[in-house]
Amino acid sequence: MDQNLTHRNHYIPRFYLKNWSLDGKTIQTYSILVSNSKVPYWTQQSIKNSAVWNDFYTRIEGDKEIDNFEHWFDREFETPAKPVFDKLLNGQKISYEESVVLSHFVFAQYVRTPAAYLRLTEQNIKLFPKILEETTAKINREAEKIRKGYPAFQFQKTVRESFFPMKVTVDKEQSLVEIKAVVGRGSYLDNLKHLLSSTLKVAEHHDWRVLHASEDISFPTSDDPVICLNYRNADDYDFKGGWGRKNCNILMPLSPRLILFTQVGAKGPYKDLDHSPYYSKLFRRMIIQHAHRYVYSDRPQKGMLELNARVVNAQLYEREKQEMAGWHIEQIQAERNL
């Protein structure tokens, strides 16, 4: 095994989580899924061991393991965004170019978490069977034409390299083509590469504003910190908004006192939201409700059971633990068994 591989993939950057750390090393963590009721509601965890999934981004090429996604995130998104975050936290204005860097980071963060993996995988499972069926049928029709003497159809070649685990079997005698694919880590990484290259442009023109919490509110963050919000009123909203969908609100906590906000297709300054006790309380509620498995804070927060009650389930907890532990081997085997 290559000793230079990262393996421990942080899906939330450590520099970001440190904004909720009182000592620069640890953070208060609320677990939504626990093994038994005796587990404390809040525990102090090392940032180094928070928001980590071993080999979440590791991919396979032949017999070689490659972790260039982790380095790509750091090089293309985290490192450029760090000084922009520092300016926002210090109350400084940012340039248009820095706003684009910020947009790239927030968009990347939206799609790089376990919660995003589940969203995209669910979407892939729904779409891919039909896509593969249509593609196979088209290839088979063209193969039959070739067998009858018609000229070969020139299929358009894809420009981008695909990480999608796929096997194509050709039966020359029957002029049939069979396509098999695995929907899992490989398809997710393929999604990420596409989203963070060609689709990334959709995020570049948002008018980001930094909103302040009211004095009595402290914003937490979570393991799924970017919220795409369809908001109708305080009792009627959902988290299924889109980056290019007009009037969708996009939020991301920056610190216990600050939250990043934009509305697609609109311009700020959103003065009625800034320092507002009403909206600060509402944003805090949304952050907690949107969490996948963990809420992070600088100190234990009250009212968690009302907003996102933890699930006490030993079997489910153990199953998820085992799935994460066996994730890498299972994904490798699935791809090699194609």
Model region roles, listed by residue range:
Residues M1-R8, R14-L338:
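Alpha-helical structural context detector biased toward long hydrophobic helices
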